[in-house]
Amino acid sequence: ALHHAKKYKRPVHLMGLLTDVQSAHANPKHLYALLDFFRKEEQKEVYLHLFTDGRDSPPHSAVKFLRDLRSNMKNGEKIATIMGRFYAMDRAKLWERTESAYHAMVFGMGHCTATSAEEAISEAYNRGETDEYICPTVISENKKPVATIGDNDAVYFFNARSDRARQITKAFVQSGFETLNG
């Protein structure tokens, strides 16, 4: 991902589950190591697309995990989207869920918008959503998405297991995603 980003002068997008060390799907230490790696390699544009847990962790624990993540963001990395794993980690071929996640990350079109990940979580809780079901939320600055995943950008999926990564990954790598859900 780094070689590609540097060669083509493109941003790096990290996407995966925001959870604690008890999860079978992701480990925050892996994400923190990636942030450290890209910082040491002087990669200037690093954007995060976070999937909140609430299934393998308590249903309102994303705020704590986000606080821990923020303490490891030291080089201008920005959170671009945040959403529940219900959308981004579906494996039941319920493509409308995947499409919602994809549209938030690629087109900056989320069901919800917020000016920070903290605001997104707070608003989700106010709507009665738990971490697993936080609607795909685009984080904006000056009424524009912080970042979207564009053509030729480098994308790194940091989940440890592949079973819940396949469907969203397919949306990124197979041409004509809109026809996949038919």
PLM ranges: what are they?
Residues 1-182:
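…; additionally, a secondary subgroup of soluble metalloenzymes is captured
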